[in-house]
Swiss-Prot record:
Domain KH type-2: 40-110
Protein name, as recorded: Small ribosomal subunit protein uS3
Gene: rpsC
PANTHER family linked: 30S/40S RIBOSOMAL PROTEIN S3, SMALL RIBOSOMAL SUBUNIT PROTEIN US3C
Cellular component, GO annotation: cytosolic small ribosomal subunit
Gene3D superfamilies: 3.30.300.20, Ribosomal protein S3, C-terminal domain (3.30.1140.32)
CDD domains: KH-II_30S_S3
Quaternary structure, from the entry: Part of the 30S ribosomal subunit. Forms a tight complex with proteins S10 and S14.
Family: Belongs to the universal ribosomal protein uS3 family.
BP-aspect Gene Ontology terms: translation
Origin organism lineage: Bacteria, Pseudomonadati, Pseudomonadota, Alphaproteobacteria, Rickettsiales
Keywords of this entry: Ribonucleoprotein, Ribosomal protein, RNA-binding, rRNA-binding
Length: 217
């Protein structure tokens, strides 16, 4: 089971170690609000694709307000000069949701080498610059262990190195207990658009076991 299912979704729940990316309560309009959240997340990722965004958490504490928390490696790109970019984003979300109370919080990801989303985006960016996929994967693995990662698995699929036949190459180092629910495993994917086609990147990072006095998000 742990080998097939998404490592993040497998651990989501109030008694487990992961949390939902959208927190809201709506009896009749759940579908509409959920689609809005997807559009907001897509808009942020497109506008600030150079900021290397790790996660976009959307909370709706009431029917009149929305709180958006953005975790990124380069928060200055999202904020902009004197907050100009974040003001544009706020207005776009106000027009999309028809809400006047829009709050946006930006958080910097400091240990970005053990953040699966940022690592996957970094590998994809290197592949687009025609860096060898083996070199990109090995560099990511080494950097992860330097920042405290206990295990990492990286997979690249597609026409690697411009080969005629698509294939999958992967590297794994350290522990990767996918079946253990208390194991804090971060998982993410990314796509590299190359001249030979699309290359898919998957990253699993094991950070250690969950402790009762600490909840990982």
């Amino acid at each position: 089971m742990g080998q097939k299912v998404c490592a993040h979704g497998f651990r989501v729940g109030p008694t487990l170690i992961k949390d939902w990316d959208s927190i809201l309560y709506a009896e009749k309009h759940y579908k509409t609000l959920f689609i809005q959240d997807l559009k907001i997340r897509d808009l942020i990722n497109k506008w600030f694709n150079q900021a290397q965004i790790s996660r976009v958490l959307i909370e709706r504490p009431s029917n009149k307000s929305i709180i958006i928390n953005i975790n990124a490696k380069k928060p200055n790109i999202i904020i902009g000069k004197n907050g100009s970019e974040i003001d544009k984003l706020k207005k776009a979300i106000e027009n999309m949701t028809f809400l006047k109370e829009v709050y946006i919080n930006i958080h910097e990801v400091r240990k970005f080498n053990i953040d699966a989303a940022i690592v996957a985006q970094t590998i994809a960016a290197q592949l687009e610059k025609r860096v060898s996929f083996r070199k990109a994967m090995k560099t990511a693995i080494q950097a992860s262990f330097k920042q405290g990662g206990q295990g990492i698995r990286v997979s690249c699929s597609g026409r690697l190195g411009g080969a005629e036949i698509a294939r999958t190459e992967w590297y794994i180092e350290g522990r990767m207990p996918l079946h253990t629910l208390r194991a804090d495993i971060d998982y993410s994917t990314a796509e590299a658009i190359t001249t030979y086609g699309v290359i898919g990147v998957k990253v699993w990072i094991y950070k250690g076991e969950y402790k009762e006095n600490k909840r990982y998000n």
